[in-house]
């Protein structure tokens, strides 16, 4: 561990030199890249330096105990040794966590795609519940939510809704929401009072910046069409809706939320860039992890990750076996109990893999 920490400190000092280089300062991409790298490892370096200082003090204090000391002084030194050993242990554990490989996408904004799956109208209504749950969670975090594309049903649900959440650390918190969410409840239209089971799928994609994924104009086919509202009726006689197809990968994105074709194209391009980036990211991750089963969510969107049981006011996350009897509060955006537990499980798994 100490060798890795020393290498991190050496890199931090090298970055300080690079960030003072006029050639780097004049290159905005390099400046941003190195500044972010330095920011990412700064806490690790600061804690490592504190750790080295504590170990040096501990070494000196233990050496003092080898000298001839009066009883009062010996007791004081013993207390100091005990305190320093406690600090040493705390800092050591903290450094282990800081050395856990950080997902480079953690600080990014996210694009969330929620779709009604098995269950027809009830699944579409549940997709709406999930959208509102994430919107309220984002609001509590101080993040901004913006709808990119929505396909409504006549009962007020969503066949599909795609929205962006802008906020630092959004992907770190929401990436574990990938998968199939199951709901068990009595539909309002059910006269017999029978419980129905429906599902909705959630995909969480990190927003890709232009410098990270280069999409050439020649590789994108642009189709325009008239936008439509609930039930398929036309709501705009102009060809304002846009469909983008990334020819090399076959990824397709549509957007008709705005009245302006230009704005719809801008929104669609954000989603296209994120989906293409996510496709490459998933392929690279699958290759890297092909022989190692992850403990927390594989990202497989057909995987049932959570069940929302309305009659029992219960939500269960099947990946970590956590059940909470607060479904009503969770749908109001109080997701911290689940998200924090999933983050901790992920860190523990990565620490184990790193040892």
Curated annotation (Swiss-Prot):
Leader peptide range in chain numbering: none
An example Gene Ontology CC term for this record: cytoplasm
PROSITE patterns to which the protein is assigned, alphabetical: RF_PROK_I
Keyword list, A-Z: Cytoplasm, Methylation, Protein biosynthesis
Compartment(s) where it occurs, according to its Swiss-Prot or TrEMBL record: Cytoplasm
PTM entry text: Methylated by PrmC. Methylation increases the termination efficiency of RF1.
N5-methylglutamine sites (modified residues): 233
UniProt-recorded Gene Ontology molecular function terms: translation release factor activity, codon specific
Function in brief: Peptide chain release factor 1 directs the termination of translation in response to the peptide chain termination codons UAG and UAA.
Protein family according to the UniProt entry: Belongs to the prokaryotic/mitochondrial release factor family.
Protein name, UniProt field: Peptide chain release factor 1
């Amino acid at each position: 561990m100490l060798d890795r920490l020393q290498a991190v400190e050496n890199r931090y000092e090298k970055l300080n030199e690079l960030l003072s280089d006029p050639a780097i300062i004049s290159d905005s991409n390099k400046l941003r890249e190195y500044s972010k790298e330095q920011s990412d490892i700064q806490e690790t370096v600061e804690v490592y330096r504190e750790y080295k200082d504590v170990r040096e003090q501990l070494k000196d204090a233990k050496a003092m105990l080898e000298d001839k000391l009066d009883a009062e002084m010996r007791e004081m030194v013993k207390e100091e040794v005990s305190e320093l050993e406690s600090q040493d242990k705390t800092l050591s554990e903290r450094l282990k966590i800081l050395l856990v490989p950080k997902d480079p996408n953690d600080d990014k904004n996210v694009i969330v795609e929620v779709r009604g799956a098995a269950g027809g109208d009830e699944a579409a209504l549940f997709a709406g519940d999930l959208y509102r749950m994430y919107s309220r969670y984002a609001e509590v975090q101080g993040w901004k939510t913006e709808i990119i594309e929505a396909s409504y049903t006549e009962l007020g649900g969503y066949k599909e809704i795609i929205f962006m959440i802008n906020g630092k650390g959004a992907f770190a918190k929401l990436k574990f929401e990938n998968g199939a969410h199951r709901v068990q409840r009595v539909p309002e239209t059910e006269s017999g009072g029978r419980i129905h089971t429906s599902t909705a799928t959630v995909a969480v994609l990190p927003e890709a910046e232009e410098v990270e994924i280069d999409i050439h104009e020649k590789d994108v086919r642009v189709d325009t069409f008239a936008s439509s509202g609930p039930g398929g009726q036309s709501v705009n006689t102009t060809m304002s809706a846009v469909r983008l197809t990334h020819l090399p990968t076959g990824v397709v994105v549509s957007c008709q939320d705005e009245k302006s074709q230009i704005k719809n194209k801008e929104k669609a391009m954000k989603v296209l860039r994120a989906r293409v980036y996510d496709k490459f990211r998933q392929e690279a991750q699958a290759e890297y992890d092909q022989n190692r089963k992850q403990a927390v969510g594989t990202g497989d969107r057909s995987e049932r990750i959570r069940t929302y049981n309305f009659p029992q006011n219960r939500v269960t996350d099947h990946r970590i076996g956590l059940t909470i009897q607060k479904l009503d509060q969770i749908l109001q955006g109080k997701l911290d109990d689940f998200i924090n537990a999933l983050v901790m499980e992920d860190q523990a798994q990565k620490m184990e893999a790193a040892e």
